[in-house]
Curated annotation (Swiss-Prot):
Protein name: Acyl-CoA Delta-9 desaturase
Positions of Fe cation 2 binding: H136, H245, H274, H278
Motif mapping: Histidine box-2: 133-137
UniProt source species: Acheta domesticus (House cricket)
Compartmental location: Membrane
Length: 359
């Protein structure tokens, strides 16, 4: 029930209280067609400004990749790779695991660092990113999912950014509880000044540093360190929404689309273990195993946990994982070898044992 709404008499006289039964029936007939009016079917509305922008970004990124191998200084290419890692952490460790899922807590110095890293990534401010991601998890693979993977690879990868949001996305987004982010002064500071911070952090600084620090050309700095880096980071993030919802194993829940995808995990800094993540979205590792090689974000969080800047790290006990694997998994859960309690009986029965020991 909404606040301040009760069934007790209030003393307020509404229009319906002043008319007789006959008039009420007549009024109901007038209002009935409006109440029963069918909902208009959703019609995709292309945002041509975004289409043109993303075409330019990808053409510029291809040119930037060419320059990285032909004329750009090695320092510029290395700088672009570092910025990709830094901005990626702003999404994975910041907007995603910290603010969208609250899988751990961070002291203000770390939150400031993650906010700046997130601004470098330029994927909307933290507040909007987290809200849309919470909607994605609560209404995954439905019309209320901002990047509904059932609408195809292209839509879930980038197409969702080229059209107006489905009405269900907007409607469900309004019902998402965002009070925790609204109380975070760092998040709200970024939201308020985003249109000032983002151009400076994402475009201006990455372009000027190579020019003034190691005498790079403006063209190489712009196309390699800025546009190639930015567009590459975007696509790595998008692969989580597209590829990781289509291809891979489902050891934790075979009834949902998200899957375990090593390639995506490597490119998206640990976000490719997506079947696990959708089953246990509150685990700060976003994976069952804390393998740093395929989950750089977990290494980042663990480092700051050691120095006390990250704390209250939430994870899942082995027993809970095992119960879920047995109940809904597809049988692809990893085993360490012969005799592992997770080894399927059909594998045991079908195995061939050669050179058996004789008495």
């Amino acid at each position: 029930m909404a606040p301040n709404i009760t069934s007790a008499p209030t003393g307020v006289l509404f229009e319906g209280d002043t008319i007789g039964p006959a008039a009420k029936d007549q009024q109901a007939e007038v209002n009935a067609p409006e109440a029963k009016k069918p909902r208009e079917p959703y019609r995709r509305q292309i945002v041509w400004r975004n289409v043109i922008l993303f075409i330019y970004l990808h053409l510029a990124a291809l040119y930037g990749a060419y320059l990285a191998f032909t004329s750009a200084k090695i320092a510029t290419t290395i700088f672009a790779i570092i910025l990709y890692q830094v901005s990626g952490v702003g999404i994975t460790g910041g907007a995603h695991r910290l603010w969208a899922h609250r899988s751990y807590k961070a002291k203000w110095p770390l939150r400031v660092i993650l906010m700046l890293c997130n601004t470098l990534a330029f994927q909307n401010h933290i507040y909007e990113w987290a809200r849309d991601h919470r909607v994605h998890h609560k209404f995954s693979e439905t019309d209320a999912d901002p990047h509904n993977a059932t609408r195809g690879f292209f839509f879930s990868h980038v197409g969702w950014l080229l059209v107006r949001k489905h009405p269900d996305v907007k409607e469900k987004g309004k019902g998402i509880d965002m009070h925790d982010l609204e109380q975070d002064k760092i998040v709200m500071f970024q939201k308020k000044y985003y249109l000032i911070l983002m151009p400076i952090v994402c475009f201006l600084i990455p372009t000027t540093i190579p020019v003034y620090m190691w005498n790079e050309t403006w063209s190489n700095a712009w196309f390699v360190a800025t546009l190639f880096r930015y567009t590459f980071t975007l696509n790595m993030t998008w692969l989580v929404n597209s590829a990781a919802h289509m291809w891979g194993s489902q050891p934790y829940d075979k009834y949902i689309n998200p899957a375990e995808n090593l390639g995506v995990a490597l490119g998206a800094m640990g976000e490719g273990w997506h079947n696990y993540h959708h089953v246990f979205p509150w685990d700060y590792k976003a994976a069952e195993l804390g393998n740093y090689r395929a989950n750089f974000t977990t290494a980042f969080i663990d480092f700051f946990a050691r120095i006390g800047w990250a704390y209250d790290l939430k994870t899942v006990p082995v027993s809970m994982i095992q119960r879920r694997v047995e109940r809904t998994g597809d049988g692809s859960h990893e085993v360490w070898g012969w005799g592992d309690k997770d080894m399927p009986q059909e594998d045991i029965d079908g195995a061939v044992i050669e050179k058996r020991k004789t008495q």
